[in-house]
């Protein structure tokens, strides 16, 4: 069941960082938050797999779920999040913002941004309601394209366990533009509405 979360912004557009698959790595989160602050983002959208590294992955560099929780809790009022396949009620107990919804919708100045992890909804199985941009993660492989119905589809990749030979990545949404960048600040792709 989707949570519909609407931000009413009255002509003031927000800048969002969209981040998925941290998997408990404190150094990976710190690098991403350096980009968050450096680019002037105002809201952090977490697409799940926040604290737990998952049994299929090796141990991430700097595994520190409590440190990740502490860093995120300090900015809880600026975070919206959805549940990943590695997130549980135990993880929720450590975090001071909700993470247990499978998806949520942000409406920013009329633009519909769907956030989901990717294990329930993704580019092949979209949520029932339409969106201008669909953000997801889960596969750790970034992608950015416009599909046949004009929806921008963005897999943010992962700052911790990038796959396919990719660098650690995240996404930024700002005033109709989606950008994929590395945690070192290199822009890999952009797409405009």
Question: Residues of each region from the PLM?
Answer:
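Intrinsically disordered, low-complexity N-terminal regions enriched in serine/proline/glycine
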Residues: 3-4, 35, 172
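Intrinsic structural disorder/low-complexity segments
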Residues: 7-10, 26, 88, 120, ...
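Conserved beta-sheet core of the metallophosphoesterase superfamily
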Residues: 101, 109-114, 119-190
């Amino acid at each position: 069941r989707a949570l519909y979360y609407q931000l009413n912004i009255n002509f003031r557009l927000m800048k969002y960082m969209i981040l998925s698959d941290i998997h408990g790595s404190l150094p990976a989160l710190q690098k991403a938050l350096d980009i968050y602050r450096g680019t002037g983002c105002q809201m952090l959208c977490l697409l799940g797999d926040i604290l737990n590294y998952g049994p299929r992955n090796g141990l991430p560099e700097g595994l520190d779920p409590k440190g990740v929780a502490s860093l995120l809790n300090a900015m809880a009022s600026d975070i919206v999040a959805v549940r990943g396949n590695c997130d549980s009620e135990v993880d929720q107990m450590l975090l001071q913002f909700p993470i247990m919804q499978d998806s949520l919708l942000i409406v920013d100045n009329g633009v519909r941004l769907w956030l989901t992890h990717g294990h329930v909804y993704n580019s092949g199985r979209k949520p029932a309601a339409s969106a201008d941009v669909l953000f997801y993660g889960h596969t750790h492989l970034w992608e950015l394209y416009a599909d046949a119905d004009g929806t921008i589809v963005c897999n943010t990749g992962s700052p911790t366990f990038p796959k396919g030979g990719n660098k650690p990545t995240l996404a930024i949404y700002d005033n109709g533009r989606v950008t994929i960048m590395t945690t070192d600040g290199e822009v890999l792709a952009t797409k405009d509405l």
